[in-house]
Amino acid sequence: MVDKLIHPWDLDLLVSGRQKDPHKLLGILASEDSSDHIVIFRPGAHTVAIELLGELHHAVAYRSGLFFLSVPKGIGHGDYRVYHQNGLLAHDPYAFPPLWGEIDSFLFHRGTHYRIYERMGAIPMEVQGISGVLFVLWAPHAQRVSVVGDFNFWHGLVNPLRKISDQGIWELFVPGLGEGIRYKWEIVTQSGNVIVKTDPYGKSFDPPPQGTARVADSESYSWSDHRWMERRSKQSEGPVTIYEVHLGSWQWQEGRPLSYSEMAHRLASYCKEMHYTHVELLPITEHPLNESWGYQVTGYYAPTSRYGTLQEFQYFVDYLHKENIGIILDWVPGHFPVDAFALASFDGEPLYEYTGHSQALHPHWNTFTFDYSRHEVTNFLLGSALFWLDKMHIDGLRVDAVASMLYRDYGREDGEWTPNIYGGKENLESIEFLKHLNSVIHKEFSGVLTFAEESTAFPGVTKDVDQGGLGFDYKWNLGWMHDTFHYFMKDPMYRKYHQKDLTFSLWYAFQESFILPLSHDEVVHGKGSLVNKLPGDTWTRFAQMRVLLSYQICLPGKKLLFMGGEFGQYGEWSPDRPLDWELLNHHYHKTLRNCVSALNALYIHQPYLWMQESSQECFHWVDFHDIENNVIAYYRFAGSNRSSALLCVHHFSASTFPSYVLRCEGVKHCELLLNTDDESFGGSGKGNRAPVVCQDQGVAWGLDIELPPLATVIYLVTFF
């Protein structure tokens, strides 16, 4: 009988919710008698029905919620099914062997399981012809882990997981479940407390703030972006002009944000009209708080359900790719929120965060910092990045707050941080993680770009890992952004005293590969919108917007502009309302957008503005000494080719010069390509005069141009 097969101590552990290996008590138990026994644990039930070889049987109540049915020898897990309390008829979860393998453990615990998203969390799968969901969790401090959901009435004793190893892997395959099932983890901590957590590896969640995960299938979508993906893998250099977007506040319809599928069509059409090559999405990983803009993440493997399902997000990506628009995702591996339902003290003890409070809690954001010394934690983060690239076809990751990851003292006072093993302030583990991240991405996903939002002078951010660098493709040039705004916020009368703010960034422009960002960070928290930062009346402010954005386009570095900046949004950005699109009914806003579209088109079609732009060869000063008139001029070359160039002239004062002479030697021909003061862009119409080559005894030494107020003029120049 069952008495001989189940030790009372094991049964007590099962009933009390502390049994780490429920499979040794449940499922098919072989005996020395003529029969084997199917054992089911159903706490609170009065009867359990079992379908055996097509016939209905009622199991015998044993004790403490345990039921058994004697069956002939040779019965396997495929020969019977169990009626669950919710009416589901499915195979027995406790009749299956372990599915998490030794190679999984080996790779995961050394931080190199690059497809961990296919093995951890809730994975729809088929085992020996039987469909179900494999639930796997890492919780090394837990006494018991159960999966709870609608399917078991959220009862933590019904579906306890089996502990696979001493390193804290728990597993259970539950037949009969599928996509859309709601679930959470119920965990018994070392101290005996029962806590309920959402799934760190969850791929879909109910709308915030519930945090309830849903089983989602990331494999079923039929992609049609093969041409894009093939072309991306072969592209080594090209123009990158990025439209930074917060999906929840770009456009609304009937008082709500657009869905992923609605957004796909409108955003792709808009980006094509405006000649953007990429969109960068503020984090769409699941997050509980709208006001965090997505930067406090609880679901690192899930697109937020605010705008639709996982498959609808895949459609969003697919459609933009078909329209030749790349997608960059803001990704936050530096810190996570303290919300009790998510990663914080996940199994009752610090797990994803540092153990020491001073190092764990980040003073800037009141969030936890990841413990990069744990291989399982870095594998979790690495898996998240690779998931978005593999299953979601994302084209780039912009890593947020890199400086906070690089330094142990970031945002902390003396005594609030501990030095590394060498006594320094660098966070050696996170530096190694970033190198590992970039190495794997560039090896596994050719053509994918990585961007670092890094605000310090840390050396080698965009240097190759094998040369001692971090391995990013590009670094945000926050110094350029700060200096540029410092200059442009000055009255044009006083800008001559601040010319160095324009020229300083060019002295270090080629030490890294840079992005020139005009980002969301500059239009929030009382900073005002871009156009309202600028002095003067309406015409003057919009003229300065045109010269600001053309200045960004012409300099070496990839380009990024936050939504609304392209048409002169007046109000400061808020994540809780859409942009003021009705402004496009007004002349200045409409013509500014025309100018931005023309600038982007010029940038894309002129290799002078993007070819080999991380090399000093692409740039040559013509004049940066005309401080009195607030004029700078320079050539942009297409690599080492010196037969032609773009001549970019920026005029930052309100004066007009009908005849302005630049020292440009050897010019054969000069053609005006773009003038931001053109009337079609809202300008005064000055500056369109054909340039005149100045000669002395047949030798070309300069150019005589008409220089409009607060404007950029761009010429195509050929040389003798």
UniProtKB/Swiss-Prot annotation:
Active-site feature positions: 400 (nucleophile), 453 (proton donor)
Q: Under which pathway is this protein filed?
A: Glycan biosynthesis; glycogen biosynthesis
Q: Which GO terms describe its molecular function?
A: 1,4-alpha-glucan branching enzyme activity; cation binding; hydrolase activity, hydrolyzing O-glycosyl compounds
Q: Mention any one GO cellular component term assigned to this protein in its UniProt record.
A: cytosol
Q: One of this protein's GO BP terms?
A: glycogen biosynthetic process
Which reactions fall under this protein's catalytic activity?
A: Transfers a segment of a (1->4)-alpha-D-glucan chain to a primary hydroxy group in a similar glucan chain
SUPFAM superfamilies per the record? (Trans)glycosidases, E set domains, Glycosyl hydrolase domain
* EC number from the UniProt entry: 2.4.1.18
Look at the named UniProt entry and state the broad enzyme category this protein falls under: transferase
Tagged with keyword Transferase: yes
> Superkingdom of this entry's organism?
Bacteria
Q: Which UniProt keywords apply?
A: Carbohydrate metabolism, Glycogen biosynthesis, Glycogen metabolism, Glycosyltransferase, Transferase
Q: Which InterPro entries does the UniProt entry name for this protein?
A: A-amylase/branching_C, Branching_enzy, GlgB, GlgB_N, GlgB_N_E_set_prok, Glyco_hydro_13_cat_dom, Glyco_hydro_13_N, Glyco_hydro_b
Keyword Transferase applies: yes
UniProt subunit comment: Monomer.
Q: What does this protein do?
A: Catalyzes the formation of the alpha-1,6-glucosidic linkages in glycogen by scission of a 1,4-alpha-linked oligosaccharide from growing alpha-1,4-glucan chains and the subsequent attachment of the oligosaccharide to the alpha-1,6 position.
Identify the PANTHER family for this entry: 1,4-ALPHA-GLUCAN-BRANCHING ENZYME
Family to which this protein belongs: Belongs to the glycosyl hydrolase 13 family. GlgB subfamily.
> Known NCBIfam families for this protein?
branching_enzym, PRK05402.1, PRK12313.1
What's the protein name?
1,4-alpha-glucan branching enzyme GlgB
Which source organism does the UniProt entry give? Chlamydia pneumoniae (Chlamydophila pneumoniae)
